[in-house]
Amino acid sequence: RDFPLADRLAERTGAVVVVDNDAKALALGEGWCGAAVGERSFLAMVVSTGVGGGLVLDGRLLGGAAGNAGHVGHVVVDPDGPQCACGNRGCLEAVASGPAIQRLTGAPPAEAPPEVRRRTGDLVGRAVATVVNLLDIQLAVVAGSVALGFGAPFFEAAQQRLDLECGLDFTRGARILPAGLGADGPLVGA
């Protein structure tokens, strides 16, 4: 923070430099050559140390007033859940991030039991359903060490929740997919 990284890199390289977050870079990578190829509107999420998002609508990556459009980590998915660093209770990041999983289980996320993997997927599906219902998108692409590490139980639970909560004509059939580029998605997008 408070370091002019883009300016310094531009001075040294002579290139145009833009600094952004991993989830927005994931959105670009997945849209170019990953699971979202051909989609004009979608959400890309990283579920890892934190929970972030990048949002593409009508072919454009959204920035937002502070550059954080699509940041789904602070969508409340469990109002009675633990307090989040932002001050709210039950934000997705407070219940689904790697540190949250470790607090819950007392072990690294890689050692989480199947029921925790499914519950985490369910909560991510709930947040994605909010975005799908609000913005009329049909796809969420998810990466990050927690999501990809939890694998099929995570993605199956996420899709089941999405199916339950997206019953409108224009939201029915929305999908949650693992990032086609895996952990390399943000690098490709950068």
Q: Where are each of the predicted segments found?
A:
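ATP-binding/phosphotransfer module of carbohydrate and carboxylate kinases, centering on a glycine-rich
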Residues: 7-15, 29-39, 61, 76-190
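Short, intrinsically disordered, charge-biased short linear motifs at domain edges
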Residues: 68-77
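A cytosolic small-molecule/anion-sensing beta-strand core signal
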Residues: 57-58
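Short glycine-rich anion-binding loops that position phosphate/pyrophosphate groups of nucleotides
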Residues: 48-50, 146-147
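A short alpha->loop->secondary-structure connector
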Residues: 64-65
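Active-site glycine-centered loops adjacent to acidic/histidine catalytic or metal-binding residues
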Residues: 22, 48, 190
